[in-house]
């Protein structure tokens, strides 16, 4: 049986903390990150605030600017590689 699913809120909170920590590691302000990502500062604030589910295109742009990849993981813990079915 698969482990219990984390709540969506937990996922968004973890994403917010991870992105904020990475931005701090790089010594960037939210405004600088937004400029690098080609998004508005409000997008960075929304992602880091973790209050709502952010738009995927904004998340992808910010992840790319942070030098990060987003990874899809099944509930069983397997990583799904691009192009896999």
What are the functions of these language-model segments?
Residues 2, 72-85:
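Short, charged recognition helix plus adjacent turn
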Residues 17-35, 61:
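Short basic helix-loop element that most often maps to the first helix and adjoining turn
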Residues 11, 18, 32, 43-46, ...:
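Residue-level recognition of specific faces of alpha-helices
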Residues 38-53:
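Recognition helix of helix-turn-helix/homeodomain-like DNA-binding domains
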Residues 57-73:
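DNA major-groove recognition helix of helix-turn-helix/homeodomain DNA-binding modules
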Residues 2-25:
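A short, Lys/Arg-rich alpha-helix, primarily the initiator
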């Amino acid at each position: 049986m698969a482990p219990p699913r984390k709540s969506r809120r937990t996922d968004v909170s973890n994403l917010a903390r991870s992105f904020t920590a990475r931005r701090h590691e790089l010594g960037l302000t939210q405004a600088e990150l937004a400029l690098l990502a080609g998004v508005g500062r409000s997008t960075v604030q929304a992602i880091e605030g973790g209050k709502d589910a952010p738009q995927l295109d904004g998340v992808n742009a910010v992840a790319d600017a942070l030098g990060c990849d987003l990874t899809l993981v099944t509930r069983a813990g397997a990583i799904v590689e691009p192009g896999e079915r």
